[in-house]
Amino acid sequence: MTVSDSPAQRQTPPQTPGGTAPRARTAAFFDLDKTIIAKSSTLAFSKPFFAQGLLNRRAVLKSSYAQFIFLLSGADHDQMDRMRTHLTNMCAGWDVAQVRSIVNETLHDIVTPLVFAEAADLIAAHKLCGRDVVVVSASGEEIVGPIARALGATHAMATRMIVEDGKYTGEVAFYCYGEGKAQAIRELAASEGYPLEHCYAYSDSITDLPMLEAVGHASVVNPDRGLRKEASVRGWPVLSFSRPVSLRDRIPAPSAAAIATTAAVGISALAAGAVTYALLRRFAFQP
């Protein structure tokens, strides 16, 4: 699922001096829930879905409880399977166009205040290095796509539901979870030409171990117990994100075209270089 195909957002590196071949494009893959945002993206929309008549009060309470458990202890494979069953059963018969409309209308009120400032900074740093940014989530594509666009991501990979006559059947076409995430990443890398050994990945959950293993540079964010143990054994960096902020309060990361233009102006280039250097030092990765 491509979020944007514009040249500025694709971040293709320029031709290197001397006419040599350009450096291969690389990517940074981000889990969404509890890595970029502080809650479950799907469960966060339970209130607007209720307000528009898609959920009853009992379903809202059940979703709130699931959110509490998710935040309290993270979600293991069994919990994720139960959550998947609950959510697919809940949305059977929903009108897809209505869901998309609700998400688009309420996105900035519901989700963008939950974005970790540290995650937004890290995404900006990767973009300044010329990398594509890919959001990878087990949540539905109707939710993940708009969030990814708001973050300035290049691609989004998410769970796809089966749709008939414009309504969800309650069955899943592709579950973007566990090994499914890793397979989706490998397929995108093959399509886009990403050398995965030079790519980055970030997640909070042990269930995303296959995704982290698929790249050359893995880091864990606010990890659950299982993933923290794996990170210790493998020597993966452990990042702590704790400051949710509104994207409306942040200045968007400059595009590649903007960077190239301002680079010709000494003072602008110096400022951009200082920002880039500070971000790279903060998150300890190579340009």
From Swiss-Prot:
Binds 1 Mg(2+) ion per subunit. The keyword Membrane applies. It is an enzyme of class 3 (hydrolase). SUPFAM superfamilies: HAD-like. Residues 1-23 are annotated as: Disordered. The active site is at D31, D33. InterPro entries: HAD-like_SerB, HAD-like_sf, HAD_hydro_SerB1, HAD_sf. Belongs to the HAD-like hydrolase superfamily. SerB family. This is Probable phosphatase Rv3661. The lineage of its organism: Bacteria, Bacillati, Actinomycetota, Actinomycetes, Mycobacteriales.
